[in-house]
Each structure stands twice: as C-alpha cells, then as structure tokens.
Amino acid sequence: MENIIVIKLGGTASDNLTENFFQKITEWQGAEKKIVLVHGGGHYITKMMEALQIPVETKNGLRITNQQALEVTKMVLIGQVQPTITSAFQKRGISVIGLNAGDTGLLEAERLNDRDLGLVGKITKVKTNLIEQLLAGNIITVIAPLGIDNTYNWLNVNADTAACEVASALKAEALYLLTDVPGVKNESEIISEINTTEINKLQTSGVIKGGMIPKLESAAFAAKHGVGQVIITDSLENAGTKIRSKVAIG
C-alpha cells in the first residue's frame, strides 16, 4: 500500500495535540495519504507507578519492566493514553480506531537479550493485514507499543522502536517521531541531518544520551529498511532532524 505516513506520538504529545496537528492530518487525508499513529506514554506510566509506589528504573533509555510494571504499562497505554488520542480525533469527525497487540496478534515480539530490562521486547513481526484493511477504508489506526511473544506473554516495547518497525513493515513514505524537543541538539543547535553512520560517534561524544539513544537507533533502522524519510521533531510543521541512511555524493 502506497502513501502511508506513520507518526509516533511521545512524551506528553497525546495531551497536546494542536489544531495545527489535526489540520495537517486532514490535509494529508485530502491528498489520499494513509495515516498510522504509534503512541508512547512513558510520562504517564511513570506518574502512575510513582502514585502506586512502584520503583521506576531505566537502563540506556529503556524502562526496566517487571510484571507489576508491565501491568501498569498496559493499563496506562490501553486504558488512558490511547482513548485520549482517539477521542481527540473523533471530536473532530476523523475516523479512527485504537489497536494493540491483543488484536489479531498485531505486534509479535520476543524478549531482549539484556535480561536486566525484564519484560521488555523487540518487535519480530508486524501483521500488516489488519492495518492495511483499516487504511483502505480511510480509518486512522492508533497503535499501543506492546508486543506478544510466541507463548502469548505481553512485553513492553519502546514506542520509537515499535513505530519504526511498523513504518518499515508498511514501507511508509515518511515517519515522524514526535517528541518533546524540536530535533536532535548539539548543545543549543538543532542538527538538521544525521547520517546513520554518525550515530555511534554522537553517542560516544555525549551529544545524544538517555531516551534519544534508542530513538536514533530506531530511526536508523527505519531509514535502512524502506522508509522514505525519517524525521525527529516536536511538531509536523517543524523541520526537525532528518535521519538518512546514505552518505551524500558531491
């Protein structure tokens, strides 16, 4: 399927969807673009865990997830964040549906090799049939970043990773990773473009750290696996940082 745009909503973006955002979505739909959203919810998961007095721990930008933390993650993503997003679309008369790994095993996953992270997984397969059927009906799909393994256990998946896997599986023409910052910064300057070969150097030099590490690694994967363009930004209007997979010639 052509003309697919995947958008990852992260940080507190689900509570700050602007009229400009919805206007852009409407413009894209008018141009026969098909829209898929993958949402995070880390901020709200942390707030809920703190309220329940569950320790919050991370490693290399990923949340360490035991069974208790996983249950909170599922509750917040499927029961709080996703309905907030879908309701905002419905309020504006835009057809939308929320999906998660429980829907026809949408996102198959396996645990990461780093067992210190607990019940954290990586996507091994995106079952695109359901998504494509909905997109053919001009219905926006909103996907929670949770996976199910081959023994039907749920796994927490980094939302950037999930978005990049979905975009790659759909061969999207564009992937927007929306976050709380306007792009990748080197001190106070936004880096306009990053080659995938530069990411390790930027990490070693401390330019990128924390949650930006898995974000850039995921973006690099998407850029190398069939996604037309990958952009890290804080809004659909801003240029942000483009991730490219080949060295420019000339």
Curated annotation (Swiss-Prot):
Q: InterPro entries in the record, alphabetically?
A: AceGlu_kinase-like_sf, AcgluKinase_fam, ArgB, Asp/Glu/Uridylate_kinase
Pathway per its UniProt entry is: Amino-acid biosynthesis; L-arginine biosynthesis; N(2)-acetyl-L-ornithine from L-glutamate: step 2/4
Which GO BP terms, alphabetically? arginine biosynthetic process via ornithine; L-arginine biosynthetic process
Gene Ontology cellular component annotations, sorted alphabetically: cytoplasm
- Pfam families noted in UniProt: AA_kinase (PF00696)
Query: Site feature Transition state stabilizer: at which residues?
Result: K8, K215
Report the subcellular localization. Cytoplasm
Q: Which UniProt keywords apply?
A: Amino-acid biosynthesis, Arginine biosynthesis, ATP-binding, Cytoplasm, Kinase, Nucleotide-binding, Transferase
Cited Gene3D superfamilies: Acetylglutamate kinase-like (3.40.1160.10)
State the reactions this protein catalyses: N-acetyl-L-glutamate + ATP = N-acetyl-L-glutamyl 5-phosphate + ADP
EC nos: 2.7.2.8
Binding-site list for substrate: G41, G42, R63, N156
Q: Which GO terms describe its molecular function?
A: acetylglutamate kinase activity; ATP binding
General function of this protein = Catalyzes the ATP-dependent phosphorylation of N-acetyl-L-glutamate.
Say which family it is in.
Belongs to the acetylglutamate kinase family. ArgB subfamily.
The molecule here is called Acetylglutamate kinase
Which species does this protein come from?
Listeria welshimeri serovar 6b (strain ATCC 35897 / DSM 20650 / CCUG 15529 / CIP 8149 / NCTC 11857 / SLCC 5334 / V8)
